Design a protein with these regions (language model features):
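Solvent-exposed serine/threonine-rich low-complexity stretches and specific carbohydrate-binding patches
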Residues: 75-85
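Short carbohydrate-recognition loop motifs
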Residues: 8-29
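Extra-cytoplasmic beta-strand recognition segments
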Residues: 18-20, 24, 33-63, 90-97, ...
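Short, tryptophan-glycine- and acidic/Ser/Thr-enriched carbohydrate-recognition patches
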Residues: 1-8
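Extracellular beta-strand ligand-recognition surfaces/modules
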Residues: 91-131
Length: 134
């Protein structure tokens, strides 16, 4: 598809285990986003660690993860891209990242699967976000 609207990914959650079904293939970043919107604040000038695990049904290149302020996409901890291999668990670890602009009242975790193949299924689990131990 071009930049026309397609069906949103099917998203289910079960006790910290998330499953994303992507029935339609996409070709560019930001075309297959899932947002986990929280009430978790982010402190200014404070490093945080993030980790999670993925398991994809098919190979998918350029999966994007971004943790950002719910009120400003310009105030974020990081934007990282990862390539997932079919059937292989992949662990993401992002240590000691700091908000770019300053404190955030609430954070959202964005997963983007733009560039996904048709019929993709991705599981996301073991999500950890915490202040870096000093």
């Amino acid at each position: 598809p071009g930049w026309t609207e397609i069906d949103a990914p099917d998203f289910t959650a079960d006790k910290g285990h998330y499953t994303v079904q992507l029935p339609t293939a996409t070709f560019a970043q930001w075309q297959a986003q899932v947002h986990l919107i929280t009430d978790i604040p982010g402190e200014a000038d404070t490093p945080y660690d993030f980790s999670c695990k993925f398991l994809a049904k098919k190979d998918i290149k350029g999966v994007t993860i971004k943790i950002t302020d719910t009120s400003s996409d310009d105030n974020f901890f990081f934007i990282k891209n990862y390539d997932l291999k079919a059937g292989e668990e992949y662990q993401v670890k992002v240590p000691a990242s700091v908000l770019k602009v300053g404190a955030a009242d609430a954070l959202k975790l964005v997963f983007d699967f733009g560039g996904n193949p048709e019929g993709e299924k991705v599981e996301i689990y073991d999500i950890i976000f915490q202040k870096t131990a000093q």
